[in-house]
UniProtKB/Swiss-Prot annotation:
It is a single-pass type I membrane protein. Residues 298-317, 601-621, 819-854 are annotated as: Disordered. The keyword NAD does not apply. Residues 298-310 have a biased composition (Polar residues). This is Neuropilin-2. Expressed in developing CNS, PNS and in some nonneural tissues including limb buds, developing bones, muscles, intestinal epithelium, kidney, lung and submandibular gland. GO terms for molecular function: heparin binding; metal ion binding; semaphorin receptor activity; vascular endothelial growth factor receptor activity. It comes from Mus musculus (Mouse). Residues 21-864 are extracellular. Residues 28-142, 149-267 form the CUB domain. Residues 642-802 form the MAM domain. Residues 890-931 are cytoplasmic.
Length: 931
């Protein structure tokens, strides 16, 4: 049989069958324009889709800046089995190699899908086995509504509303509202109504899936996120001082509600002339809203919630579900805030009348709510001593202010059970004069204005070096570069008055090893320029050399470093030393407009009692002020306790110094008649210890806040007056937990004039206190006065020895009877020191002429042996001085050796405490002629 006709028959049957099948199964896939909305379905939908399908669609938008949105019909049925056989996948591009947005199967329809660009790739695949109804989706151009609802607000006040308010808002919105304020203006935002779609499965605050409102401290997605809000709970009042506050409003394609309405207004920030960083932050007043307070757990009866943890609250307090040192109370301050002190209080149960309180606790801080640092004292976690009963308030001061946003209190020990109420003290960074954040955090400084010497990878580029808002930070190419080789630079756009920087460590990503994941800079230098070419370094005013600033001790906790104002448009930071993980840095620049800078004294510390000391809670606002000179100017990297600098001007306050008000009298100046004395204004106060000689003696102590100077010594200045012959002694002692060390002493009448005292406070690994001890001997009439204690930033250390006679060597000591013990110095004074102490105000006839007729009598017993020792010591010093004078006279009388002898005397070194050596030079003219 001829095979040729048979072949033609088979071919005809094949093509005819193929044509019939093609007519029955319409082709799937294609290229679709989303200019007009349309639908894509699986073949045969809603009937079962056929087997062996491989359909591909490309959906594109007519404009390159447009996006595409896909919404699926809830009737969705594709074979399961982990999407191995039948599935639909969507990719963010025009091919199968684009990023996968989702791969779906089963009976649950996918959520709304939005492209990042103008093209989407869709693929549907089925195998030979089981089939289902398939899918149906609608594609269209994603309409954000930004043309209608995105606005900038610059007027002093205004209203922000969701689109269509008070009617229901539209679907698929992405709106941005930005409030812009001028420097020294605070933005206050108050919501009037709030109603967005609520997620019934919402777990916690900010867990919003459908419609929500984000509020940003700065430009959206650049500045830190303050909070995410949805449902019907109205956000509390917001106060921003960074100059930019933004809101982004997102809605999906489903349920729509009435939306929101809010009012904003701007108020001028005028810092006080004597800025004090000791303001209650709002736990007691309610300025900290309930939504900002949370806890690890709450007692099951619902009567001891975190929101009841406000100081002096009349309804119980916060109690966890279980009493454990793993529990914590947390406060979100919403913005970066200086924390300087914490006040705690227990609670009495309204149901059982039993008292519960926390006896000790730890402090944890964070800038983002995820990376936490336990507050340390030296190398160990600091354990704060808290309450001894359920009602008294205990104030604990931090020895250095902390810049943070989130605060956790972790109870360590307690009585009967954990119960806590508290208040936080501090201030905002921008409260200080000329301390505006110039735009790194808020995004006002663009990415193009941030540069660096080198960059490791894109994820750690200079644009990631924004304070707090970035989770990574800047990493240079070489993690272990030479000191000063790498730098990070900020272009401020226009010349500004720059007064400081805030420096923070950085976090690495997945491509950085675990050891390198957390890096920070320990020491750095700062340079500045007006043109980007001519650079100058910030100078240390004490040494007139390039200032080497202290950096961070933790990768998440920021530190402020201030310096004298300089004009600059460009600022560079040069890392000099860093953590083992290498160089990692985030940054903000502080300053103000070039014409706004004013020389103002400021401090960053509260005038509160020392930590671990039980004190009555200061109810009066004046009780936390300590005078116009109570603070040292622009802390300038001196990490000293708040309240150290003090002039004792306010009647009920001694800054951070502790003394017995019954012994140290507060006296008031009247303008001096002596032109050689320094001039004081009327009503200026000082402290005075006095005796009229009718009692056996007098002894008083004046104790500083805790000092921690592990890195470098500083110079302490004060004014003093000592009258009363050889029975008067004033000494300064460094007291630590294990030892006491004499630093300075005078033990004789100094006359009626006020004198300067200067002492070097040495570096010391442990925390210590400075103690002024005054002694007026038995049967002696005299007085000792002290005023204006402060840390000097303009006196070189080599000049910080005044008078020289007060530095008599290591072995010299004035014996003081052991009348004190323990660490709490209020107990020492109240319980163990004898004598009648009174707090009075008296006037003097002159700066150096007190009225002796009104002097108080004191009672103190000096041992006769002690008096003998003092007398013999005085005689020894007198004989030594006489011999030295004779030797000097003889030496200078011999002309051949006079020059060499004077030179030898000039080069004589006095060796002081802690290995510090200071040269005391004698004037050439006085060397021989006055002998």
């Amino acid at each position: 049989m001829d095979m040729f006709p048979l072949t033609w028959v088979f071919l005809a049957l094949y093509f005819s069958g193929h044509e019939v099948r093609s007519q029955q199964d319409p082709p799937c896939g294609g290229r679709l324009n989303s200019k007009d909305a349309g639908y894509i379905t699986s073949p045969g939908y809603p009937q079962d889709y056929p087997s062996h399908q491989n359909c591909e669609w490309i959906v594109y938008a007519p404009e390159p800046n447009q996006k595409i949105v896909l919404n699926f019909n809830p009737h969705f049925e594709i074979e399961k089995h982990d999407c191995k056989y039948d599935f639909i996948e969507i990719r963010d591009g025009d091919s199968e190699s684009a990023d996968l947005l989702g791969k779906h199967c089963g009976n649950i329809a996918p959520p709304t899908i939005i492209s990042s660009g103008s093209v989407l790739y869709i693929k549907f695949t089925s195998d030979y086995a089981r089939q289902g109804a398939g899918f149906s989706l609608r594609y269209e151009i994603f309409k954000t509504g930004s043309e209608d609802c995105s606005k900038n607000f610059t007027s002093p006040n205004g209203t922000i509303e969701s689109p269509g308010f008070p009617e229901k808002y539209p679907h698929n919105l992405d709106c941005t509202f930005t409030i812009l304020a001028k420097p020294r203006m605070e933005i206050i935002l108050q919501f009037l109504t709030f109603d967005l779609e609520h997620d019934p499965l919402q777990v916690g605050e900010g867990d919003c899936k459908y419609d929500w409102l984000d509020i940003w401290d700065g430009i959206p997605h650049v500045g830190p996120l303050i909070g995410k809000y949805c449902g019907t709970k109205t956000p509390s009042k917001l106060r921003s001082s960074t100059g930019i506050l933004s809101l982004t409003f997102h809605t999906d394609m489903a349920v729509a509600k009435d939306g929101f309405s809010a009012r904003y207004y701007l108020i001028h920030q005028e810092p006080p002339e004597n800025f004090q960083c000791n303001v209650p932050l709002g736990m007691e007043s309610g300025r900290i809203a309930n939504e900002q307070i949370s806890a690890s757990s709450t007692f099951s009866d619902g009567r001891w919630t975190p929101q009841q943890s406000r100081l002096h609250g009349d309804d119980n307090g916060w109690t966890p579900n279980l009493d454990s040192n793993k529990e914590y109370l947390q406060v979100d301050l919403r913005f970066l805030t200086m924390l300087t002190a914490i006040a705690t209080q227990g609670a009495i149960s309204r149901e059982t009348q039993k008292g519960y309180y926390v006896k000790s606790y730890k402090l944890e801080v964070s800038t983002n709510g995820e990376d936490w640092m336990v507050y340390r004292h030296g190398k160990n976690h600091k354990i704060f001593q808290a309450n001894n009963d359920a009602t008294e308030v205990v104030l604990n001061k931090l020895h250095m202010p902390l810049l943070t946003r989130f605060i956790r209190i972790r109870p360590q020990t307690w009585h009967l059970g954990i119960a806590l109420r508290l208040e936080l003290f501090g201030c905002r960074v921008t409260d200080a004069p000329c301390s505006n954040m110039l735009g790194m955090l808020s995004g006002l400084i663009a990415d193009t204005q941030i540069s660096a010497s080198s960059t490791r990878e894109y994820l750690w580029s200079p644009s990631a070096a924004r304070l707090v808002s970035s989770r990574s930070g800047w990493f240079p190419r070489n993690p272990q570069a030479q000191p000063g080789e790498e730098w990070l630079q900020v272009d401020l756009g226009t010349p500004k008055t720059v007064k400081g920087v805030i420096i923070q460590g950085a976090r690495g990503g997945d491509s950085i090893t675990a050891v390198e994941a957390r890096a920070f800079v320990r020491k750095f230098k700062v340079s500045y320029s007006l043109n980007g070419k001519d650079w100058e370094y910030i100078q240390d005013p004490r040494t007139q050399q390039t200032k080497l600033f202290e950096g961070n001790m933790h990768y998440d906790t920021p530190d402020i470093r201030r310096f004298d104002p300089v004009p600059a448009q460009y600022v560079r930071v040069y890392p000099e030393r860093w953590s083992p993980a290498g160089i990692g840095m985030r940054l903000e620049v502080l300053g103000c407009d070039w014409t706004d800078s004013k020389p103002t004294v400021e401090t960053l510390g509260p005038t509160v009692k020392s930590e671990e000391t039980t004190t009555p809670y200061p109810m009066d606002e004046d009780a936390t002020e300590c005078g116009e000179n109570c603070s040292f100017e622009d802390d300038k990297d001196l990490q000293l306790p708040s309240g150290f600098n003090c002039n004792f001007d306010f009647p009920e306050e001694t800054c951070g110094w502790v003394y017995d008000h019954a012994k140290w009298l507060r006296s008031t100046w009247i303008s001096s008649a002596n032109p050689n004395d320094r001039t004081f204004p009327d009503d200026k106060n000082f402290l005075k210890l006095q005796s009229d000689g009718r009692r056996e003696g007098q002894y008083g102590r004046l104790i500083s806040p805790p000092v921690h100077l592990p890195r470098s010594p500083v110079c302490m200045e004060f004014q003093y007056q000592a009258m009363g012959g050889h029975g008067v002694a004033l000494q300064v002692v460094r007291e630590a937990s294990q030892e006491s060390k004499l630093l300075w002493v005078i033990r004789e009448d100094q006359g009626s004039e006020w004198k300067h005292g200067r002492i070097i406070l040495p570096s010391y690994d442990m925390e210590y206190q400075i103690v002024f001890e005054g002694v007026i001997g038995k049967g002696r009439s005299g007085e000792i006065s002290i005023d204006d204690i402060r840390i000097s930033t303009d006196v070189p250390l080599e000049n910080c020895m005044e008078p020289i006679s007060a530095f008599a060597g290591e072995d010299f000591k004035v014996d003081i009877p052991e009348t004190h013990g323990g660490e709490g110095y209020e107990d020492e004074i109240d319980d163990e020191y004898e004598g009648d102490w009174s707090n009075s105000s008296s006037s003097t006839s002159g700066a150096g002429d007190p009225s002796s007729g009104k002097e108080k009598s004191w009672l103190y017993t000096l041992d006769p042996i002690l008096i003998t020792i003092i007398a013999m010591s005085s005689l020894g010093v007198l004989l030594g001085a006489t011999c030295a004078g004779l030797l000097l006279y003889c030496t200078c009388s011999y002309s051949g050796l006079s020059s060499r002898s004077c030179t030898t005397l000039e080069n004589y070194n006095f060796e002081l405490y802690d290995g510090l050596k200071h040269k005391v030079k004698i004037n050439h003219q006085k060397c021989c002629s006055e002998a």
